[in-house]
Amino acid sequence: MKVEWLTEARAEYRQFLQYYKTEVGLPYAKKFADTILGSINQLAEFPEMGAVKYDTLMGKHDFRALFIENYVCVYRIESDTVYVYHL
C-alpha cells in the first residue's frame, strides 16, 4: 500500500517542523520529523493501525486517527492508498 499526503497535511507538517526549528532547535526538529514520518510510513504496511470511532462523523466516513505522541494523524484508506488528511 502507498501513503500519500494531501497538500494541507504536508503544509501542517512543515509548519510544525519550522516551529520546532525556530523555538527549540534543529536536534528536536529532526527528532520530531523522524517520529512523525516513521509512524506515518508504517501505515503503508499496517494501514488499519489507526483508531476508527464509527459513532462519530469522521468514523462514519471511514477516517482513522493515528496518535503519535502529542499529535493526531487523520487519514483514510481508499483501495490501495492511505491518504493523510491532517496532522
Annotate the PLM regions:
Residues 61, 68-72, 76-87:
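Enriched for short, Lys/Arg-rich terminal
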Residues 2-3, 7-57:
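Basic, Lys/Arg-enriched alpha-helical interface segments
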